[in-house]
């Protein structure tokens, strides 16, 4: 999917220690690409720049970066755009989320705020790049996972580990397309090297479309367990959630409501333009240390 010779180098990876960043930098190394990394938790080592995109002295500390892969949420990016352009940015790939549409009507205040930040971040990137002649690509993944590291599928595995079973709100018939962070890292690199992806936004679903229940059963299997799924009436599920909420940091009642919603997207434009070909959903939690 990626052709190193088509990348304009050197590359700057922002959010290098993020979930996607942890997979992107080994890929760039394997391709022999010259790159540097920006992270607020960067080690004191060659090729790393410690800082945030909003730091007032960022420009002075950055190396030349004609290509930028922004691998943290897109709302972090706008404060750093001027500094990145000053260091030669010509090509930008940034990550938003399909949540910008799937959670647009959520009654949850936190989710409403996240949707606003995503939408505002996307608009700021488009507007800046249009004025400054920077080719942009915005990637919108579905449900991101990386065994033992994410806050989506791995949280589900943690709940299964604690309870021994998984309660569903209703039958869990809503569609899901979990996508691995490593596939997203490959997509960012491929899009940066693909002129057809200039000035476009893409949805990036995973390699399989499953019901929520099927996805949960795959998680059980990936843990080496027999699936034990318990469908509950939505009202009863909400009551159980309210009692268990202290044990579920970051979870919201809307997660139960969405178990019956179809959150499926079309990845064919990304496949046609830069070879998007994500893996099927077969997580391997039982291989974790």
Name each model feature, range by range.
Residues 9-31:
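N-terminal Rossmann NAD(P)H-binding glycine-rich loop of SDR-like oxidoreductase domains
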Residues 150-155, 169-192, 199-200:
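Substrate-positioning beta->alpha
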Residues 137-155:
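Flexible, glycine-rich beta-alpha linker
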Residues 14, 38, 71, 92-98, ...:
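SDR active-site strand-loop-helix element
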Residues 43-89, 94, 98-109:
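NAD(P)H-binding glycine-rich loop region in Rossmannoid oxidoreductase-like domains
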Residues 112-137, 154:
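Active-site Tyr-X1-5-Lys
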């Amino acid at each position: 999917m990626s052709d190193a010779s088509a990348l304009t180098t050197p590359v700057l990876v922002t959010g290098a220690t993020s979930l996607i960043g942890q997979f992107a930098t080994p890929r760039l190394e394997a391709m022999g690409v010259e790159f540097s990394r920006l992270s607020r938790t960067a080690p004191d080592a060659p090729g790393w720049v410690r800082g945030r995109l909003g730091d007032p002295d960022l420009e002075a500390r950055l190396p030349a970066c004609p290509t930028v892969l922004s691998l943290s949420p897109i709302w972090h990016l706008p404060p750093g755009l001027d500094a990145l352009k000053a260091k030669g940015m010509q090509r930008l790939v940034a990550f938003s989320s399909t949540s910008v549409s799937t959670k647009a009507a959520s009654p949850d205040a936190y989710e409403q705020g996240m949707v606003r930040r995503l939408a505002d971040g996307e608009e700021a990137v488009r507007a800046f790049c249009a004025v400054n002649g920077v080719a942009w690509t915005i990637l919108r993944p579905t449900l991101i996972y990386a065994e033992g590291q994410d806050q989506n599928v791995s949280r589900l595995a943690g709940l299964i580990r604690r309870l021994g079973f998984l309660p569903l709100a209703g039958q869990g018939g809503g569609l899901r397309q979990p996508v691995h962070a490593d596939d997203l890292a490959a997509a960012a690199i491929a899009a940066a090297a693909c002129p057809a992806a200039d000035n476009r936004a893409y949805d990036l679903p995973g390699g399989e479309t499953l019901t929520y229940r099927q996805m949960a059963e795959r998680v059980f299997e990936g843990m080496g367990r027999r699936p034990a799924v318990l469908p509950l009436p939505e009202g009863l599920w909400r009551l159980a959630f309210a009692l268990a909420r202290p044990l579920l940091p970051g979870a919201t009642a809307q997660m139960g409501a969405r178990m019956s919603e179809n959150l499926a997207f079309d990845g064919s434009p990304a496949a046609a333009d830069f070879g998007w070909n994500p893996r099927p959903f077969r997580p391997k939690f039982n291989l974790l240390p």
